[in-house]
Design a protein with these regions (language model features):
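Blade-terminus and WD-like Trp-Asp/Gly-His loop motifs, strongest in beta-propeller folds
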Residues: 30-35, 69-77, 112-121, 165-173
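Bacterial N-terminal signal peptides
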Residues: 6-14
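Sec/Tat signal peptide C-region and signal peptidase I cleavage site
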Residues: 15-19
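Periplasmic/extracellular electron-transfer cofactor-ligation site
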Residues: 50
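A flexible loop/linker signature enriched in serine peptidases of the S9 family
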Residues: 21-23, 41-47, 55, 60-66, ...
């Protein structure tokens, strides 16, 4: 019996080692502004890795879930969401890691989506304001808020639910995907009337919207 257990144990350890060498479920990849580094979340922590390849560096080690990293325009800061205080809040840390700073404190979940500039972050939240102040009242649809990297009181940036926002360098336009109804974003090959589309928004006094994609899938 002992002779049978040794090969089985060796096979198990070999499989475990192979699994460690080929990690899966790395999510929310974000390329640094200079294109040299990729930030991503893996098993509840934030990592960075050179875009040319190499060993990943772990930036957060908290037992809570850290996810959705986004870079500041100068590439010196990374904002991310963490539920280390109960619900998900927006945190800010240096690109090398270190002690992060908590920026939001609302009781609902909040997720960073992009930096407006080096001093301001746009994030998604559902603060449940009065119906007159939001596009679609309810708990399912979030709004876009803006907060300083120093913290403080957030401002409503858009009552329209915008996901995966990308601002142009001059800040005059933004790309985003819409949200028509609930669908698992990780579902593959989904096509229906509620799949997300990409839109281009021209900011300014006369704000305009242009639909970029018409594909029936995500």
């Amino acid at each position: 019996m002992k002779n049978l257990m040794i090969p089985a144990l060796a096979l198990f350890l070999s499989a475990a080692a192979q699994a460690d060498d080929s990690p899966l479920w790395m999510r929310y990849c974000a390329i640094s502004p200079d294109g040299q580094t990729i930030a991503f979340s893996y098993q509840g922590d934030i990592y960075t890795v050179p875009s040319s390849g190499g060993k990943a560096r772990q930036l957060t080690t908290h037992p809570a879930h850290d996810t959705r990293p986004v870079w500041s325009p100068d590439g010196q800061k990374i904002a991310f969401a963490s539920n280390r205080s109960g619900n998900f809040d927006v945190f800010l840390m240096n690109k090398e890691g270190g002690e992060p700073k908590r920026l939001t404190t609302h009781s609902t979940n909040e997720y960073p989506t992009t930096f407006k500039d080096n001093g301001h972050i746009l994030y998604l939240a559902n603060i449940l304001q009065d119906a007159k102040d939001i596009q679609f009242p309810g708990t399912r649809f979030m709004q876009v808020y803006e907060i300083s990297t120093d913290g403080g009181r957030p401002d409503l940036y858009s009552s329209l639910y915008m996901e995966n926002i990308a601002l142009s360098k001059d800040g005059s336009k933004l790309l985003y995907n819409d949200y028509k109804g609930y669908e698992d974003p990780w579902r593959k090959h989904h096509q229906s009337s509620i799949t997300r589309d990409i839109w281009l928004c021209t900011l300014g006094k006369d704000r305009s919207f242009q639909k970029v994609t018409t594909f029936g899938g995500e």
